[in-house]
Amino acid sequence: KPVTTGSTAPAGVPVAVNPPPSVRPVVPVTMEPAPAKLPPPAPMPSGKRAIVIAIDAGHGGEDPGALGPKGAREKHVTLAIAKELQRQINAERGYRAELVRTGDYFIPLRKRTVIARKKGADLFVSIHADAAPRAAAFGASVYALSDRGATSETARWLADSENQSDLIGGAGNVSLDDKDKMLAGVLLDLSMTASLSSSLNVGQKVLSNMGRITPLHKRRVEQAGFMVLKSPDIPSILVETGFISNPNEAAKLATLSHQQSLARSIQSGIRQFFQQNPPPGTYVAWLRDSGKIAPGPREHVVSSGESLALIAQRYQVGLAVLRSANNLRSDTIKVGQTLNIPTTALAAQP
């Protein structure tokens, strides 16, 4: 569980903030073979940047997070899911995923959002696995920052002289260092309000998609004062992928197939949000403004004589993207098989 600050969310595990220890190898959470690495995302056309998603694998290093009944550690599960989510996001043109931590080491909570900001993140996604005293507790959840947490964070930023030169407003890059205190307060409040609204929006889309592949603990986005969500300029969500304290869910969380399904559902929610709200100057904004984004999710039933490459060409979607969207490890498909066509596919066919 993540550390909370005055939250009514499930109790977190207090963590001492120490300098990061030396990096140690991650202990594998599954014996299944790792998916093949995909090539880096294709470069964007001039003036059409990629949307950047910062993925934060919860806990790490001396902070193991929650423990499963058979010894599974949250820090290993979250890193495995984060890496799979990064792989899937990077398979889609117009998006780039950056990991906040890439190995088994601890990063102080506030530094995680600092790292995301330095990477130019348009969205911050923190991955966790829940725990509860009752082993029967189950289901995935999504959190955004609470209103009370947002108010206290705005006050902290104004009081902290180190933030006076920081930038807010995402791609707008609005500096506070030349603003008087009242104007800085207004700008921060507007930025935090917009960020929170976007967080709730993308959070609900992620939650709805997760509900298709795993039980939900709550069917609405919950709000709490989690430290990693307190960025005034970056929409931020915290995803509880399931209860690692539940024997059944702990076993699923350790499998590659479930990690892939969770990552795919999170990616789908993120994609839906940015297709409706693409940051200006991005490739996705250009697709939308040019009318080249298909109106909604599509399915294709494989018929005799078709290959995956032909289907990808028909819908003008990358072969790697089509494989990722359908969790395919090869290009082998069967007649009658239903394929999901990513919503960013160009509508080449009626």
Labelled PLM ranges:
Residues 1-19, 259-263, 339-341:
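Surface-exposed edge beta-strands and adjoining flexible/disordered loops or tails in beta-rich
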Residues 6, 15-177, 192-196, 200-202, ...:
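Catalytic-core regions of hydrolytic enzymes
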Residues 2-4, 276-296:
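Intrinsically disordered, low-complexity mixed-charge segments
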Residues 74-77, 81, 85, 112, ...:
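Stable alpha-helical elements in mature extracytoplasmic
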Residues 123, 133, 184-284, 323:
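Active-site-adjacent mobile loop/cap segments within catalytic or ligand-binding domains
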Residues 48-52, 92-94, 120-124, 137-139, ...:
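Extracytoplasmic
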